[in-house]
Amino acid sequence: MKAVTYAISSLIMAASLPSLAQSPSPQTSPSPQATEALPPGPNPNSQYRLGPDSLPQAGVPKGEIRGPYTLPCQAYPGTQHTYWVYVPAQYDPAVATALMIYQDGQAFKDENGDLRAQNVMDNLIYRREIPVMIGIFINPGRRPDQPEPSPTNWGDDTTNRRIEYNSLDDKYARVITEELMPLLYKEYNISKDPEMHGIGGSSSGAIAAFTVAWERPNDFRKVLSNVGSFVDLRGGYVYPERVLASDRKPIRVFLCDGRNDHRGTLRGPYDEKMDWFLQNVRLLKALTQKGYDVNYTWGVNLHGQKFGGAIMPDMMRWLWRDGPVSTEPNDMVERGFRQPVTKKD
């Protein structure tokens, strides 16, 4: 039985999809200093707080974060990616496990940040609300002489992030599937089933995650998108038309955005191709019209992780809702919390 969702996608299936020109502009990210008008009243982010599922809980086994590791990049010669590996306490090398990859890994694993994905996985795995899974926190590529991204500087101006994440080709998908995944398969017992592979991100990391699944649906089937930059940074606003013009792909998508995300005036006069909220809604309508397994939540949040972090546990539950389950009444293992695997000498 499917989980209760935030909104019923079928309600918007008949909605019209505004048509936009199909020639993307190879532009760069807007200036982080740019400001836009906000509605009167409290800060739009003021109501969003992390809940207990995003915080360490007494008695819940904590996974281990290993790394950092360095991945030399072939798709973008001269660059390298730093990544960390989350290994849950319940990981058993004898049992194939699920996989979740987070772009802008430094932000998703930040213990004082707005996302704290490792806590979410600890809590939900323990309560059997998502499968046991390996988590990967991967940063955008950079040259060795460039600084590592940090929670306060995600690297738009100092790394390869803008190009890797916002481009609509398959080069970043190659980084993940052809360069990173073979290393993970060697080290961990990760399922080869694409239904057991998820990928997510925030802002440009969200469109990057969508592009990986779009280009490689036989490798990734679940996409978590927070304030996705489906705008004209490097042509991302064309995705709704691409979705409608293509055969439906076997991917599941959760879109999260806010009414006070960047609203099209970062570069001056209003430009609908640079309206984050509009473009997320357009993508939702296209995915719904084509029959995708898609869910969404629209808040009043600004661009950032406040709202996405607050509902990340629910996004993860929905994306991973259909894992195997035992209904045997005497299965006391299934009826109990997932316990850590005893490590063998």
Which stretches of residues belong to each language-model region?
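Bacterial N-terminal signal peptides that target proteins for export
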Residues: 1-10
